[in-house]
Amino acid sequence: MKRTKQINHASFRKSWSARHLTPVALAVSAVFMLAACEQADETVSMYQNADDCSAANPGKSEQCTTAFNSAKEEAAKTAPKYASRADCVAEFGEGQCQQAPAQAGVGNTNAESQSSGSFWMPLMAGYMMGRLMGGGMGGQQQPLFSSKSPTSPANGKFVDASGKNYGAATPGRTMTVPKSALAPKPATTSTVTRGGFGESVAKQNTMQRNSSSTGSANRSMGG
């Protein structure tokens, strides 16, 4: 029997590669896509204080207290600061403001206020805390603020120091957020003018709506 002398080696190699490498490539791609998804989001719980956290997580009282205290320390550094109580109250409502602790991150932008320690900041309305797989509790937390001023975009909402909105200021609920939401925010280095933080919240709301609309459009097109 004669053997064919001419073999299309290029075609053979291409066929072998397609059969043997394509499934491997697909598997590797799937792994990377799964890893990206796992790194993109975090399930967090919203609490008003350590007691709320402890009630929802029996046996985790110590971790709840640690997370709450860490969030308060973070709030002192990153919360919006105002040169007067009136400016803070106009933004957050009566009974929602306190004097900022000394050395709470504000630079020497106002010598008189700095020397008298009269910077003002909103009270921490709650905090979000990360959760690990299997019901464990993460080591990250983020202070949250809320306004009771009817004219503020943050009225009745949980917002972080950057003005990002996390929905109704209802302790005890959980939600999925980007992992970046738990990243420490920059320390406040200057005071904001009356209404300035509300403008930040409004801008963040617009960005979030636009992002949601873009995501919905991509999904509808199969993207």
Curated annotation (Swiss-Prot):
| InterPro entries xrefs | Biofilm_formation_YgiB
**What is the disulfide pattern of this chain?**
none
Source organism superkingdom: Bacteria
Ranges of Polar residues compositional bias?
Answer: 202-223
Query: Residues annotated as region Disordered?
Result: 166-223
Matching HAMAP family = UPF0441
Q: Which family does it belong to?
A: Belongs to the UPF0441 family.
Protein name according to UniProt? UPF0441 protein ETA_04310
